[in-house]
Amino acid sequence: MSSEKLKTKPLIFSLSRNKRNNDILVKILGEQDYEVAGHTDPVNMVSDVKTRKKVNLVIMDISGFNQDIWKYCEALRLLDIPFLVLSPQQHRVIEEEGMKQGAKRVLVKPLVVKELLFLVKSLVEN
């Protein structure tokens, strides 16, 4: 068996309250040969992260979540899991809080897919 066949796909978690947006993100990332698990509940997402051997990246769409979402960002930071925050609007407070909690980047929707994929690839490969 070649080492190429033994290579595991990078695992990315997606979190969004909006199931349709989550499904789209899962599809786009899956087409790039990533293993992707979509979540709509941050509690379940963090629990799932803790049961996995390796999570390479989490993409969190904070739309529709209350201020408690930041404690889940902090949990990811403490677990040393890189994450991106997707925000419905450009707002300095959101960007500052995301970075304070350890986000690698705060992106404003709507997303440019090509840019998102470039960023995901660079984070997963590092």
Explain the meaning of each model-derived region.
Residues 109:
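A Lys-centered signature of the CheY-like receiver
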Residues 71, 90-106:
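Alpha4 helix (beta4-alpha4-beta5 surface) of REC/receiver domains from two-component response regulators
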Residues 1-28, 46, 114-126:
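Non-catalytic signal-transmission and effector/linker regions of two-component phosphorelay proteins
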Residues 22, 42, 59-76, 91:
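Conserved phosphotransfer microenvironments
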Residues 40-57:
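Acidic, metal-coordinating helix/loop segments flanking the phosphotransfer/catalytic sites
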Residues 51-53, 75-81, 101:
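Conserved phosphotransfer cores of two-component systems
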Residues 27-32, 75, 97:
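Alpha-helical interaction/dimerization surfaces of two-component signaling modules
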